[in-house]
Amino acid sequence: MGKIVATFAEPLHHICLTYGLKQSFDAMPHLNRREIRLRGKSTYIENIVAPPPLMSRSGWNTRCRNIVSVSYWRESLAIAYNDEACTKEDVYTFVIALIKAYMSYRHPYTKMRIEGNKVVSEREGRIIATID
């Protein structure tokens, strides 16, 4: 499992983040999957909202995880991803799309640009988020 952390300059808002996640997953449907391994065989479900397929009652050897998992606390946004199912470049593009969608809902008139691993406001030049 790889991990990318984005640190914002202000506390995150749940509703804006939910909007950003929906927009980002709609733009990148190949990351909107869930992997289920059952006794050594892995299958994928295309939508993480959908219920998993029927499995045996004894789930002693099952594991279920999303290809991209997002969690946040205050100013930190952590994105954990499966190294085997996607590349770091795909997830980095997903994080940039998520930040853009989040900021378009949170501050609709803010224009931003990406400078390396920083997202910067064009007018004030202040750092909106840093990506590690």
Write out the residue ranges for each language-model feature.
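A short, exposed loop/beta-hairpin motif centered on an aromatic-Gly-Thr core
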Residues: L77-C86
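Short linear proline/tyrosine/threonine-rich motifs used for host-factor recruitment
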Residues: I36-L38, T62, I79, R113, ...
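A short, structured beta-strand/loop element
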Residues: C64-S71
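Intrinsically disordered, low-complexity proline/glycine-rich segments
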Residues: V68, I127-A129
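Short, positively charged and aromatic/hydrophobic N-terminal segments
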Residues: K3, T7, H13-H14
